[in-house]
Amino acid sequence: MARIAGVNIPTNKRVLIALQYIHGIGPKIAGEIIEKVKIAEDRRVNQLSDQEVLQIREIIDRDYVVEGDLRRETGINIKRLMDLGCYRGLRHRRGLPVRGQRTHTNARTRKGPAKAIAGKKK
């Protein structure tokens, strides 16, 4: 099992799919990494040599923000919005949808489970 960017990627999957187990790497970036290392798309992780795994690891460390660093950066950006007191920051602070979705109905994922209203019956 290869360990890249602090994540154990599955050995029996294709490299393109296995790289997507790393937070911050999707299909597009996984394809770019495979092109840079010049690996065939149908190769599986257990068929990679140690040198190829090392090259993948170096490319990810050098060119991309992934895993803990990406999570930290995202958290810092949200905290910055909340400290500024801008509209998006207020929505984050109140636990409501940030991107303009309706909240009269729906938005239960963001707002949490429904709260019972006292005295309201059919």
UniProtKB/Swiss-Prot annotation:
GO terms for molecular function: rRNA binding; structural constituent of ribosome; tRNA binding. Keywords: Ribonucleoprotein, Ribosomal protein, RNA-binding, rRNA-binding, tRNA-binding. Signal peptide: none annotated. GO terms for biological process: translation. One of its GO terms (cellular component) is small ribosomal subunit. InterPro entries: Rbsml_uS13_C, Ribosomal_uS13, Ribosomal_uS13-like_H2TH, Ribosomal_uS13_bac-type, Ribosomal_uS13_CS. Residues 99-122 are annotated as: Disordered. Located at the top of the head of the 30S subunit, it contacts several helices of the 16S rRNA. In the 70S ribosome it contacts the 23S rRNA (bridge B1a) and protein L5 of the 50S subunit (bridge B1b), connecting the 2 subunits; these bridges are implicated in subunit movement. Contacts the tRNAs in the A and P-sites. Part of the 30S ribosomal subunit. Forms a loose heterodimer with protein S19. Forms two bridges to the 50S subunit in the 70S ribosome. Belongs to the universal ribosomal protein uS13 family. This is Small ribosomal subunit protein uS13. It comes from Bradyrhizobium sp. (strain ORS 278). The lineage of its organism: Bacteria, Pseudomonadati, Pseudomonadota, Alphaproteobacteria, Hyphomicrobiales.
